């Protein structure tokens, strides 16, 4: 079964020193069954990697290699993220006091009836309240 992947798990995998067994298991599952992400996921991931370059955490070669590796994974970008932004996503953000970015992952998991892979404690709490299966921690 596929899953919804957020940037916290993605970046923990990219920065392998931060990867746990659970994070590695998520990516084994992504390789096997694929993942869904909201339309903003690529921007979130690329932004953190770019900020890492600017702050001297990594270099441009690391950033580029990480993005190239991620591009090879069977990850489907949801084409309906923006359609739900001002409706279901905004309501979830308000209900659980999430950013709209985090609520987009929650909305996608709920809409597609998929488990959610996140390390974010607030998003995990909201997903649990919505009876969404959680993985990755």
Show where each model-derived region lies.
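Short, well-structured N-terminal submotif of metal-dependent ribonuclease cores
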Residues: 1-40, 52, 57-65, 130
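Acidic, PIN/NYN-like endoribonuclease modules and their adjacent C-terminal/linker elements
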Residues: 2, 106-137
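Alpha-helix capping/helix-boundary segments
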Residues: 10, 41, 84-85, 105, ...
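Amphipathic alpha-helical protein-protein interaction surfaces
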Residues: 19, 97-98
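Short beta-strand scaffold positions
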Residues: 37, 100-103, 118
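Acidic catalytic patch
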Residues: 39-42, 62-94
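Entry/capping segment at the start of metal-dependent catalytic domains
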Residues: 45
């Amino acid at each position: 079964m596929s899953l919804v992947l957020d940037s916290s798990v993605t970046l923990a995998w990219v920065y392998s020193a931060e990867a746990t067994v659970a994070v590695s298991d998520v990516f084994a599952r992504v390789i096997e069954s694929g993942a869904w992400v909201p339309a903003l996921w690529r921007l979130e991931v690329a932004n953190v990697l770019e900020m890492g370059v600017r702050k001297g955490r990594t270099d441009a070669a690391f950033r580029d290699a990480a993005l190239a590796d991620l591009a090879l994974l069977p990850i489907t970008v949801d084409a309906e993220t923006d359609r739900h932004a001002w409706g279901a996503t905004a309501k979830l953000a308000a209900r659980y006091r999430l950013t709209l970015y985090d609520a987009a992952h929650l909305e996608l998991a709920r809409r597609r009836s998929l488990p959610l892979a996140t390390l974010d404690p607030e998003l995990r709490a909201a997903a649990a309240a919505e009876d969404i299966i959680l993985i990755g921690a």
